[in-house]
């Protein structure tokens, strides 16, 4: 589980900078289990990712071409990960008073040539997405492989 020191560090960085990059925050055995789950999921569990939500959700290959599979607690790796993230959610609420009420997560698979164009990770007119987490499960990833997350400051400068 997340330690008090880890939670303090994450909350302080989010309050000061608006983001944090963490290496080796989750146990190695959990990462291996999540990667195994992600790659062993059958093809029919991955679906074309959409943009928007609820009635406004649509598949738009001009915006994103990845496929996603939702993580749930039906397997040990998913349960352990979601429990860890639930503790993080609770700790951030306690330290930052941000009112995050739930957490959802999915695996995303980007085939060669797939992408997700620059976007705001919140829905227009809603304030429900306050914190976003990204966990890379790629083994032996190198910068020339592409796929980096690019974060922009409010004035659009790349961080």
Describe these PLM feature segments:
Residues 1-132, 136-159:
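Fe(II)/2-oxoglutarate oxygenase catalytic core
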